[in-house]
UniProtKB/Swiss-Prot annotation:
Name of the featured protein: Chaperone protein DnaJ
Cofactor binding, note field: Binds 2 Zn(2+) ions per monomer.
This protein's UniProt keywords: Chaperone, Cytoplasm, DNA replication, Metal-binding, Repeat, Stress response, Zinc, Zinc-finger
Origin organism lineage: Bacteria, Pseudomonadati, Pseudomonadota, Gammaproteobacteria, Alteromonadales
NCBIfam families listed in its UniProt record: DnaJ_bact, PRK10767.1
């Protein structure tokens, strides 16, 4: 069975750079990796095919032999059959930085339509922006369709000519005894067309790099890790193929007051010693402004008060989270002599009273006494 063209397997052009080869390989290796396609023999075969194509095109000597003689040229270097070595060792350095899905679009010889690559943009948001939603202007470098040559790659007023060797197929047939093997056409390098007078703007590629400005609408309630897909906003396709997609990845920055946990918000609210002991009504911050919170008498530090529907509205439903206010009783500092005397008097009154004024402290002392009694027995 004849092997497929390596450039076709990776979905790249024959003048692809080393970076483009690796990018295509990482995307397809992730798509067909056995860990994700367990039990699917057809996808495992594709995975092996992708790996073999990359091993050839990533090696300058093998690539040169392949470009001139096809798979036979590589085999003559002593490569032999496909190396089915351990997958984990082969790809351990790759899966950590992969994003986006597998590449779609054409394969085969000639100038067939090929979908453009997907792009990713990391967007930083404040908590307020994430909770309320916002439209933001972004700028992304991308490959765009060349309007000068209308994507043909040929200079305006000229056109690419059909290759006279492969007659536009991008492949030629080479016979070896009883067998016929298809390989990339050496004249047009598998393109099926020859551009004798390339476009000055895109240099014959039909696309060129340009920064694109666009507005992205962020819905209310997004959180770190959420991703928005903008269809058709990725790199322009080749040979009339559709554009890829743009994925906007959210990263919500830390807030100086609130800490987010899903749709709930948490904050710490300082209260005075007297407010905790006697009770009070205080103001606490929310994303919609200040609201009043009633602190009952004898409130201990660390107590959490739940304020219903003062959190974040879910981006996936109509439910709204809560605001969890944790009160922290502050110890008074920089006391005057009179204040010190009053506190000492207060402590004396508490100590002489039979009423338990410090439930946690007295419970702790009881536990300590029991502990030492057990040790001595």
């Amino acid at each position: 069975m004849a092997k497929r063209d390596c450039y076709e397997v990776l979905g790249i052009s024959r003048d692809a750079t080393e970076k483009e080869v690796k990018k295509a390989y990482k995307r397809l290796a992730m798509k067909y990796h056995p860990d994700r396609t367990s039990g699917n023999d057809e996808l495992e075969v594709k995975f092996k095919e992708v790996k073999e194509a990359y091993e050839i095109l990533n090696d300058s000597q093998k690539k040169a032999a392949y470009d001139q003689y096809g798979h036979d040229g590589v085999n003559q270097q002593g490569r032999g059959g496909f190396d089915n070595s351990d997958f984990g060792d082969q790809f351990g350095d790759i899966f950590g930085d992969i994003f986006g899905g597998g590449r779609r679009g054409g394969g085969g010889g000639g100038q067939r339509p090929q979908q453009g690559s997907d792009l990713r943009y990391n967007m930083e948001l404040t908590l307020e922006e994430a909770v309320r939603g916002i439209s933001k202007e972004i700028q992304i470098p991308t490959q765009v369709h060349c309007e000068q040559c209308n994507g043909s790659g040929a200079k305006k007023g000229t056109e690419a000519k059909t290759c006279g060797t492969c007659y536009g197929q991008g492949q030629v047939q080479m016979r070896q005894g009883f067998f016929a093997v298809n390989q990339a056409c050496p004249t047009c390098r598998g393109q099926g067309k020859i551009i004798s007078d390339p476009c000055h703007k895109c240099h014959g590629h039909g696309r060129y790099e340009r920064s694109k400005n666009m507005s992205v609408k962020i819905p209310a309630g997004v959180d770190t890790g959420d991703r928005i897909r903008l269809s058709g906003e990725g790199e322009a396709g080749e040979h009339g193929g559709p554009a890829g997609d743009l994925y906007v990845q959210m990263n919500v920055l830390p807030h100086h007051v609130f800490e987010r946990d899903g749709n709930n918000l948490h904050c710490e609210v300082p209260i005075s010693f007297t407010e905790a002991a006697l009770g009070s009504e205080i103001e606490v911050p929310t994303l919609d402004g200040r609201v009043k919170l009633k602190i009952p008498a004898e409130t201990q530090t660390g107590r959490v008060f739940r304020m219903r529907n003062k959190g974040v509205k879910s981006v996936r439903s109509h439910a709204t989270g809560d605001l969890m206010c944790k009160v922290m009783v502050e110890t008074p500092v920089k006391l005057s002599s009179k204040q010190r005397d009053l506190l000492k008097e207060f402590e004396t009154l508490c100590s002489s009273s039979s009423t338990k004024h410090k439930p946690k402290s007295e419970g702790f002392l009881t536990s300590i006494k029991t502990f030492f009694d057990d040790l001595s027995s």
